Structure formats: C-alpha cells, structure tokens
C-alpha cells in the first residue's frame, strides 16, 4: 500500500514538473490570445482602413501633396528608410539621440501601398481614374500600380472604367503603358471599353481605342458588338468610324 502511494505521489510530482517545463518552453497563452489578438487585429485593420479612406478622399479632392506624401512610391520608401536608418535605428556608437517615428512624421506615418484595397473594393488607381486626377494616375502607373484592377461595382478594367467615366486622358495614359487593355471586357457582361465609349458617344475615346488596337468585332456575353450598339442607338458618326476601320483592316478581322 505504501509503495502504491509512493508511486502515485511520484507520478503526480512528475506530471507537475512536466507541466512547469512545458510552460517554460511553450508558454500557455492560447487561452488569452484568441480574444486579445482578435481585438488587436481589428484595431489594426480599422486604422489601416481609415488611412486608405483618407488617401482616397485626398485623391478625389486633388489634394495631391497629401497623396504624394503618404503613397508608397519608390521615392517615399527610399526616403523613409533613410530617415529611419539615420534617426531611429542608429548603429551602435553613433552619436545622437534616437528619435521615434512619430517625432519625425506627424500623425500616422505609415505609407499606403500602391495597390492597397479598401474594404469596399476600391484601389488608388480606380479612384484616380474616377476623380480624373491625372497627376496621381501618372504617379501610380510609374510606380507599378496594377493596371488590371477592376471597378468594384461595374467590374470594368482600368481602361473600361476610364471609358465609362469619359476620362480621355486616362484612357490614353493606360493604353500607352499596356495596349492589351483595349480589348479586355467586363467579366460580368463582357462589355469592352469600345462599347462603353460607343454608348457614351465619345468619338475621341473611340478613336484612341482603335488606335491602340481595340477590336470592334469582339462580341460581349449577349452576342453584341460595338457596331451593333452604334447602329441600335443611332450613333451615326461612330457607325462610320467603326465601318471605315473594319473595312481598312478587313484581313485582320476576317
């Protein structure tokens, strides 16, 4: 009987030691992490969303100095790294007082990614096209913004969005960078930028699109073409432009 209790006692001591050892190696924090981490993550997401929305508001209002300061362009990334290395992360033995980022940059100094997306699906390039903010659109294109982003409501590409909003300068800027965008339609109805330009009776955009290789014979998901649309809605001038273009490029389209 005594041996049994000794064995049982030793077993309990062994279990306690094992628990203490495992706590040292793998701290038991899981029971707190779920709640605390979710709250922290939510706060970070809300702060990030607020920052993105402030950037979008600045793009829409053409407050371009604000946008240029907070957008994660190559220049800004290099500048922030230089400031961080020089004033915040000083090498050991370098004279001077280490500063915090908040003392160098007012407010939330974090940069907003070129292709950041808000919770409602907007990106800087789509907002810049809508707002006809050509200075920021140029900056985004130069810094590698995704030209294949789609409008969160209309599901059009950047060129399709520019055609829809009759943003002639944006259409040309985007096509100069990537002419293939001229023939990429909506994944919902298959409408191409040329169909949007035709419906809006925007002759200039129609001509720009054709110049960069838009195909007027491409059918959408309803079987229609830009020519069909031009005829149906009485867009006489565009009918002539499309007809002449197809005739001049007969071997290409047949």
Regions found by a protein language model. Name each.
Residues 32-118:
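N-terminal segments that cap or nucleate solenoid repeat domains
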Residues 51, 121, 154-155, 189-190, ...:
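Start-of-repeat signature of ankyrin repeats
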Residues 53-56, 89, 123-127, 157-161, ...:
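Ankyrin repeat (ANK) core detector
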Residues 28-54, 212, 231-254:
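Ankyrin-repeat-protein effector appendages
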Residues 57-62, 127-133, 161-167, 196-202, ...:
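Ankyrin repeat A-helix N-terminal signature
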Residues 79, 114-117, 147-151, 181-186, ...:
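Ankyrin repeat boundary signal
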Residues 66, 135-136, 169-170, 204-205, ...:
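Conserved ankyrin/ankyrin-like repeat signature
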Residues 71-76, 105-112, 138-146, 172-181, ...:
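Ankyrin repeat domain, specifically the short helix-to-loop turn at the C-terminus of the second helix
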């Amino acid at each position: 009987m005594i041996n049994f209790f000794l064995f049982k006692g030793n077993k309990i001591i062994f279990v306690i030691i094992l628990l203490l050892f495992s706590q040292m190696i793998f701290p038991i924090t899981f029971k707190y992490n779920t709640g605390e981490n979710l709250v922290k993550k939510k706060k970070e997401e809300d702060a990030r969303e607020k920052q993105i929305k402030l950037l979008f508001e600045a793009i829409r209002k053409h407050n371009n100095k604000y946008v240029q300061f907070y957008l994660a362009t190559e220049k800004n990334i290099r500048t922030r790294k230089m400031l961080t290395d020089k004033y915040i992360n000083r090498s050991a033995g370098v004279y001077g007082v280490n500063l915090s980022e908040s003392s160098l940059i007012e407010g939330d100094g974090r940069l907003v990614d070129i292709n950041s997306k808000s919770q409602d699906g907007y990106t800087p390039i789509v907002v810049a096209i809508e707002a006809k903010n050509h200075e920021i659109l140029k900056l985004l294109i130069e810094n590698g913004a995704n030209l294949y982003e789609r409008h969160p409501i209309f599901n059009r590409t950047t060129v399709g969005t520019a055609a829809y909003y009759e943003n002639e300068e944006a259409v040309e800027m985007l096509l100069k960078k990537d002419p293939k965008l001229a023939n990429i339609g909506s994944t919902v109805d298959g409408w191409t930028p040329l169909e949007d330009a035709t419906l809006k009776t925007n002759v200039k955009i129609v001509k720009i699109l054709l110049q960069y290789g838009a195909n007027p014979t491409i059918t959408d998901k309803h079987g229609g073409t830009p020519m069909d649309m031009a005829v149906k809605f009485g867009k006489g001038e565009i009918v002539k432009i499309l007809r002449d273009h197809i005739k001049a490029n007969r071997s290409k389209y047949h």
